[in-house]
């Protein structure tokens, strides 16, 4: 993050009388705090970045003001929060709190670049990162991660010629195909039932977005009784 604070685990022992720098923020259960941040807040942000870039937006406020993107980001976040609640007992914020966050992002003064939020997509598509991690946690608790896997699918379309990982991602898909790309970048074990199911959810979303695997019909045919 580019925030001017540093979260520090409260259990870390400093010498007696040590004066903490003003940018230190002490947190209990730092590991759980980081999981919560990455698998919910960062999940939502990268959904805005991947989808917003796909639809030609440059900044997060532009993406948030697209109703479809906003809905997908909200429901992906909600899936992740429900899984975190099941696994760690973390409460799910109410919709009013989410509304405040979305209104902040939608402000014309909040112009964070999507290229910054979505940068290094290969890292963000890895198994334990902000998308695949919570998606697998959802499946562990019998929550279908439909919108998270949709975000992953949009991530497979992510393009930025100034981003080395984005270029590598698209080159790999071009050379090896989307199916191999999903297992490779998301680090999925196809012999594992849960991970195999996740693979197919991602693939189905990708094909639907790309409008592939659709049976063509002749729309000019005239039907008579």
Predicted regions and their residues:
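Substrate/ligand-engaging "lid" and interaction regions
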Residues: 1-225
């Amino acid at each position: 993050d580019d925030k001017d604070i540093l979260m520090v685990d409260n259990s870390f022992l400093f010498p007696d009388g040590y004066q903490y720098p003003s940018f230190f923020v002490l947190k209990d259960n730092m590991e759980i705090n980081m999981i919560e941040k990455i698998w919910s807040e960062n999940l939502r942000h990268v959904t805005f970045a991947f989808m917003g870039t796909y639809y030609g937006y440059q900044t997060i406020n532009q993406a948030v003001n697209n109703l479809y993107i906003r809905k997908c980001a909200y429901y992906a976040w909600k899936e992740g929060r429900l899984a975190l609640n099941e696994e760690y007992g973390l409460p799910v914020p109410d919709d009013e709190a989410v509304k405040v966050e979305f209104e902040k992002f939608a402000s014309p003064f909040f112009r964070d670049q999507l290229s910054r939020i979505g940068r290094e997509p290969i890292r963000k598509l890895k198994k334990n990162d902000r998308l695949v991690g919570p998606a697998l946690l959802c499946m562990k608790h019998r929550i279908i991660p439909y919108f998270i896997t949709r975000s992953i699918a949009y991530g497979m379309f992510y393009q930025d010629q100034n981003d080395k990982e984005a270029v590598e991602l698209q080159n790999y898909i071009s050379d090896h195909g989307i199916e191999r790309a999903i297992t490779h970048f998301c680090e999925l074990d196809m012999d594992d039932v849960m991970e195999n199911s996740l693979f197919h959810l991602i693939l189905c979303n990708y094909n639907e977005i790309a409008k592939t695997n659709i049976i063509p019909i002749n729309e000019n045919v005239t039907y008579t009784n």
